[in-house]
């Protein structure tokens, strides 16, 4: 089998949805079978490939068609300023991409902002969703145990407002539990992505002013979600509080929670092997 790379899996599609008319979406795609769409987080320089390059191969080998989508205003997708909460607009983009690719139903895997996107999709388009896997998702309002916003979110907005290599390093240090995973290669790749799209950074801040994080809260509607859901969390997450995982398993009718020890906000990357086994086993269950 040919090695999967960002280059040989890179594709584009045009979508037309509310506030996303004639909009270009970039994605990486490989494999055949049931569609699994993976949705990245909201940090500066984020994208589908950088978020999920440790996951795409095992999911393809397990028999899935895997799509790593760049959300609107991120990486190679078109720039955008949003007047509504980002999770909802991103969910429309997922639906639009599925329409463009002829995908009737898909499983969703979402980390952080991508988790908020998946939750909104589950509420707005339930008939298009198979199963849902969430890793430290946003969009759940206040915490009972942690002051909000948490340390990582403060650094994220600082990096958007005043991009610097040192602030990026600080954010990644909070992002991950195991500091030995932080290499100059990792930092340099993320920094290059940040510098490549300055409009994305500006537009994220404008969008956040128009629809602040407080508007993202879908907690009151969790009971509407019928999809089987696997919720995962890093015990040491410093971006989104662990007690939000309990909100999800209490609110969603068919949800289970797995907590990774010695793990930060990027469970699918920091605990990739364990996450891949857990997630693929969950998708295979009937």
Curated annotation (Swiss-Prot):
Site positions per UniProt: Transition state stabilizer: 112
EC number: 3.7.1.8
Catalyses which reaction(s): 2,6-dioxo-6-phenylhexa-3-enoate + H2O = 2-oxopent-4-enoate + benzoate + H(+)
Domain of life of the organism encoding this protein: Bacteria
GO biological process, one term: biphenyl catabolic process
UniProt keywords, alphabetically: Aromatic hydrocarbons catabolism, Hydrolase
Pfam families: Abhydrolase_1
Binding positions (substrate): 42-43, 51, 111, 180, 190, 266
One function term, GO molecular function aspect: 2,6-dioxo-6-phenylhexa-3-enoate hydrolase activity
Keyword Hydrolase: yes
A Gene Ontology term for the protein's cellular component: membrane
Residue positions of the active site: 265
UniProt similarity note: Belongs to the AB hydrolase superfamily. BphD family.
The protein's role, per its UniProt record: Catalyzes an unusual C-C bond hydrolysis of 2-hydroxy-6-oxo-6-phenylhexa-2,4-dienoic acid (HOPDA) to produce benzoic acid and 2-hydroxy-2,4-pentadienoic acid (HPD).
PANTHER family: HYDROLASE, PUTATIVE (AFU_ORTHOLOGUE AFUA_2G14860)-RELATED (PTHR43798:SF33), MONOACYLGLYCEROL LIPASE (PTHR43798)
Name of this protein: 2-hydroxy-6-oxo-6-phenylhexa-2,4-dienoate hydrolase
Native source organism of the sequence: Comamonas testosteroni (Pseudomonas testosteroni)
